[in-house]
Each structure stands twice: as C-alpha cells, then as structure tokens.
Amino acid sequence: MTISELYRSLSPLLVADQIKLVCELFKHYSHFTKSQETLDDFYGWGELMLSDFDDLDKNMGDYEKIFANTNDLHDFDSVDFLTEEQKELLTRFFKNFDGDHKSPLKENFASLWNVLASIYSSYREALRGEGIAYEGMLYRDVAEHFDPTGLKAKMYVFAGFNLLQKVEQRLFEELAREKKAIFYWDYDSYYMNNGNEAGKYISAYLHAFPNQLAGKDIYSNLTKKENITFLSA
C-alpha cells in the first residue's frame, strides 16, 4: 500500500480527475473575479492554482493569512505572523505568476490575489458537497479529522521516508498515538553529524517516531571509505 492509498482508504472523499477539478475551479474564479477569461485561457493557470492549493493543504497552511491582501513581495517585511513554510508557499505563488509574458490573468494579479481566500474556501466547499477532492484537500481532511475506527490493519509499517509533509507528520502522530505504526527511516549518519539541513528534519522525526532498526553500522554508509574498481571497456 502506498501513502496515497492509505489516505484514500481513510476518507469518504474521492480524488477527482484533473479536468473536473480545473473546470470546477474556473467557476469559482469567474464568480469572484468577474473575469471574462475563457476556460481555454484559464486552464493552464487553473492547473497552477490547483497545484498551489494542493501544496498549501499538504503543508496545512492557514489560507486566510497566506492569501491576505498582499500585493508585493516587499510586504513580507511586515508578515512576521507567518511561519517560514507559509512564507515559502507565498513566495512561490508570487513567482509562479511573475514573468515577461503578458496575459489578462497576470495583468489583474493584484485583484486576483485579494480574492484567492474566497476562491479557495468556496471551491473546497463545493468539492466537498460533491464528495470529491484534490489530493491535498483529501490528505488534510484525513489529518485534521483522524478517526481510528477507519483503520483496517492492525499495524502500519512506514519505510523509506526522509522528508515529511505536514499532513504526513500529523498522520504519523495519530497512528503512533494509537500504537499502530512502526517506522524504518531512510538516512545516513553523515547528514546527522555535519549540520546538514536534511539531518535536522531526520533528527526530529527519529525523536518523534523512533526507528525500528537498531545499530549504527547500517546508517553510516557515507562515512566509510569507498572501494571503487574501474573496469576497462
């Protein structure tokens, strides 16, 4: 079972296909922006907007703060209330809508940004009413409304993870609390002992979700001297 299959097994919602999701998003975009954009003109940007909504939900961001009335990246100087992850999401969203090529969407970016919170909220409500979702929405719903009675296995084994999204970390916490999860982490002590950014996250995960495998030798491959033999052609 993949992590995606696990989430889907714990939710009554179904992940809809991309075309359905973008077409539904277009309705809410048109309603709140009063734009005369056609679906053809919107579709590419709709996929981008959907991708950003997906990232926001998988990182469990506060959409009202992230989609506040912010018209310029320089306003970051005064948004100390945002977490680093939220600032990163916001920065990426601005960059995605930046560029040399002009389009009605880009020219009206400021007005679009100021209604994104309404689009996001209304869109998700409409999807939920149809019993469907995009992947990040479903993941977030499972993480925020975890119900252990929906678990179908006695134990879940998570192997090979090294960087978690917020929704994954929340699910791991819930399963660990129910004593229904064991973990096999993918890491090397080289990253742990050299102030590497990857090591920082793994250290936190190992503390929260102890590794099932003991022993240090299997986690020190990058610190050993390699013996490489070159074969001639």
PLM regions and their residue ranges:
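Nucleic acid-machinery interaction/catalytic patches
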Residues: 1-233
